[in-house]
Amino acid sequence: MIYSFSTARVVFGIGASVGVAAHAARMGRRCLLVTGSRPGRCDWLLEDLRSVMDDVRCVALVREPETAFISAQAEAARQAGSDVVVAIGGGSVIDAGKALAALAANGGDVFTYLEVVGQGRPFEHEPLPMVAVPTTAGTG
């Protein structure tokens, strides 16, 4: 039997977050930063990103992401020409970042791609590159 497993790069440890902006800048130049309900806690990252990116847009997720919010923010990211997503926060923020990366690269809204309750269309393009900076530990 032959198995193949490929995972994303995982960097962890004390001080690992210092390299986030430089890593993201190797993936793109126009960043969409997704944060939790208190974006001020991420000012250090916003400043780092602005020092190495051509443009940085910040989106704060104040509660569980709703489909209309994700669709609207993905369209705004597309219009802004965002080419990399950085998400810093808990599970909802990371999930929202993944959804935004996929939708910004493919167009349409959430229901275009949702199975069962939507059209269930497959993505035509790879999602935008994404850097996840989890700030909580959980089972998800």
Where are the model-predicted features located?
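Glycine/threonine-rich beta-strand-loop-alpha-helix active-site module
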Residues: A68-G140
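ATP/NTP phosphate-donor binding region
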Residues: M1-V84
